[in-house]
Protein backbone atom coordinates (compact mmCIF):
# COMPACT_ATOMS: atom_id res chain seq x y z
CA UNK A 1 0.00 0.00 0.00
CA UNK A 2 1.25 3.50 -0.80
CA UNK A 3 1.76 5.56 2.36
CA UNK A 4 3.43 8.59 0.79
CA UNK A 5 3.93 10.29 -2.56
CA UNK A 6 5.98 13.39 -3.29
CA UNK A 7 7.28 15.18 -6.35
CA UNK A 8 9.44 18.25 -6.87
CA UNK A 9 11.04 20.24 -9.67
CA UNK A 10 14.16 22.42 -9.46
CA UNK A 11 15.26 25.06 -11.92
CA UNK A 12 18.89 24.25 -12.76
CA UNK A 13 19.75 27.87 -13.64
CA UNK A 14 18.81 29.02 -10.11
CA UNK A 15 21.15 26.40 -8.65
CA UNK A 16 23.91 27.39 -11.11
CA UNK A 17 23.82 30.93 -9.71
CA UNK A 18 24.83 29.57 -6.29
CA UNK A 19 27.38 26.94 -7.36
CA UNK A 20 31.02 27.51 -8.40
CA UNK A 21 32.24 26.10 -11.70
CA UNK A 22 33.29 22.47 -12.05
CA UNK A 23 36.93 22.05 -11.09
CA UNK A 24 36.90 24.89 -8.52
CA UNK A 25 37.54 22.45 -5.66
CA UNK A 26 37.83 25.08 -2.90
CA UNK A 27 34.73 26.89 -4.11
CA UNK A 28 32.72 23.68 -4.36
CA UNK A 29 33.88 22.52 -0.92
CA UNK A 30 32.64 25.76 0.63
CA UNK A 31 29.38 26.07 -1.35
CA UNK A 32 26.77 26.90 1.32
CA UNK A 33 23.81 25.41 -0.54
CA UNK A 34 25.64 22.15 -1.22
CA UNK A 35 26.78 21.87 2.41
CA UNK A 36 23.17 22.36 3.56
CA UNK A 37 21.62 19.87 1.13
CA UNK A 38 24.21 17.11 0.62
CA UNK A 39 25.45 14.40 2.95
CA UNK A 40 29.18 13.73 3.16
CA UNK A 41 29.19 10.96 0.50
CA UNK A 42 27.02 13.11 -1.80
CA UNK A 43 29.33 16.08 -1.25
CA UNK A 44 32.32 14.05 -2.46
CA UNK A 45 30.48 13.21 -5.70
CA UNK A 46 29.37 16.85 -6.09
CA UNK A 47 32.96 18.12 -5.80
CA UNK A 48 34.19 15.61 -8.40
CA UNK A 49 31.25 16.16 -10.78
CA UNK A 50 31.70 17.64 -14.25
CA UNK A 51 28.26 19.25 -13.81
CA UNK A 52 28.02 20.10 -10.10
CA UNK A 53 24.99 22.42 -10.39
CA UNK A 54 23.01 19.77 -12.27
CA UNK A 55 24.01 17.13 -9.68
CA UNK A 56 22.93 19.42 -6.83
CA UNK A 57 19.64 20.33 -8.55
CA UNK A 58 18.75 16.65 -8.92
CA UNK A 59 19.60 15.91 -5.26
CA UNK A 60 17.68 18.98 -4.11
CA UNK A 61 14.55 17.94 -6.06
CA UNK A 62 14.87 14.34 -4.83
CA UNK A 63 15.14 15.33 -1.17
CA UNK A 64 12.26 17.81 -1.43
CA UNK A 65 10.13 15.09 -3.06
CA UNK A 66 11.07 12.67 -0.27
CA UNK A 67 10.17 15.19 2.43
CA UNK A 68 6.80 15.75 0.74
CA UNK A 69 6.21 11.99 0.58
CA UNK A 70 6.93 11.84 4.32
CA UNK A 71 4.29 14.52 4.81
CA UNK A 72 6.61 16.88 6.65
CA UNK A 73 8.50 18.94 4.13
CA UNK A 74 12.00 20.04 5.11
CA UNK A 75 12.23 21.61 8.54
CA UNK A 76 9.63 19.82 10.67
CA UNK A 77 11.86 17.16 12.16
CA UNK A 78 13.28 16.22 8.76
CA UNK A 79 16.39 17.85 7.30
CA UNK A 80 18.17 17.43 3.99
CA UNK A 81 20.87 15.54 5.92
CA UNK A 82 18.30 12.88 6.94
CA UNK A 83 17.82 11.84 3.31
CA UNK A 84 20.58 10.37 1.14
CA UNK A 85 20.49 9.62 -2.57
CA UNK A 86 22.95 7.13 -4.04
CA UNK A 87 23.03 4.96 -7.16
CA UNK A 88 23.08 1.22 -7.70
CA UNK A 89 25.64 -0.46 -9.96
CA UNK A 90 23.45 0.27 -13.01
CA UNK A 91 23.14 3.96 -12.13
CA UNK A 92 19.54 3.81 -10.91
CA UNK A 93 18.88 6.12 -7.95
CA UNK A 94 18.42 4.71 -4.45
CA UNK A 95 17.10 6.57 -1.42
CA UNK A 96 17.84 6.00 2.25
CA UNK A 97 16.60 7.70 5.40
CA UNK A 98 18.15 8.37 8.80
CA UNK A 99 17.36 10.54 11.82
CA UNK A 100 13.99 12.31 11.72
CA UNK A 101 13.23 11.05 8.21
CA UNK A 102 13.69 7.42 9.28
CA UNK A 103 11.51 8.04 12.35
CA UNK A 104 8.76 9.58 10.22
CA UNK A 105 8.94 6.73 7.67
CA UNK A 106 8.55 4.20 10.50
CA UNK A 107 5.56 6.11 11.94
CA UNK A 108 3.86 5.87 8.53
CA UNK A 109 4.49 2.12 8.44
CA UNK A 110 6.78 2.62 5.47
CA UNK A 111 8.97 -0.30 4.48
CA UNK A 112 10.11 0.56 0.96
CA UNK A 113 10.94 3.75 -0.89
CA UNK A 114 11.06 4.20 -4.65
CA UNK A 115 12.62 7.18 -6.39
CA UNK A 116 12.82 8.45 -9.94
CA UNK A 117 14.98 11.43 -10.94
CA UNK A 118 15.03 13.10 -14.35
CA UNK A 119 16.64 16.20 -15.80
CA UNK A 120 16.51 18.17 -18.99
CA UNK A 121 18.20 21.38 -20.09
CA UNK A 122 16.44 23.69 -17.61
CA UNK A 123 14.90 21.48 -14.92
CA UNK A 124 15.51 18.55 -12.61
CA UNK A 125 12.55 16.63 -11.25
CA UNK A 126 12.05 13.77 -8.83
CA UNK A 127 9.21 11.59 -7.58
CA UNK A 128 9.27 9.48 -4.41
CA UNK A 129 6.77 6.75 -3.52
CA UNK A 130 6.70 5.22 -0.04
CA UNK A 131 5.14 1.78 0.48
CA UNK A 132 4.12 -0.11 3.60
From Swiss-Prot:
GO terms for cellular component: cytoplasm. It is found in: Cytoplasm. It comes from the Bacteria. Disulfide bonds: none annotated. GO terms for biological process: fatty acid biosynthetic process. Its EC number is 2.7.8.7. The keyword Hydrolase does not apply. Keywords: Cytoplasm, Fatty acid biosynthesis, Fatty acid metabolism, Lipid biosynthesis, Lipid metabolism, Magnesium, Metal-binding, Transferase. It holds the Pfam family ACPS. Mg(2+) binds at residues 8, 64. GO terms for molecular function: holo-[acyl-carrier-protein] synthase activity; magnesium ion binding. It catalyses: apo-[ACP] + CoA = holo-[ACP] + adenosine 3',5'-bisphosphate + H(+). The keyword Metal-binding applies. Belongs to the P-Pant transferase superfamily. AcpS family. NCBIfam families: acpS, pantethn_trn. This is Holo-[acyl-carrier-protein] synthase. The lineage of its organism: Bacteria, Pseudomonadati, Pseudomonadota, Gammaproteobacteria, Alteromonadales.
Amino acid sequence: MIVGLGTDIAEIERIEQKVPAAGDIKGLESCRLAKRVLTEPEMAIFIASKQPARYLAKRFAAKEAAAKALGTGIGRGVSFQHIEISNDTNGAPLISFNGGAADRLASLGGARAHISIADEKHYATATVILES
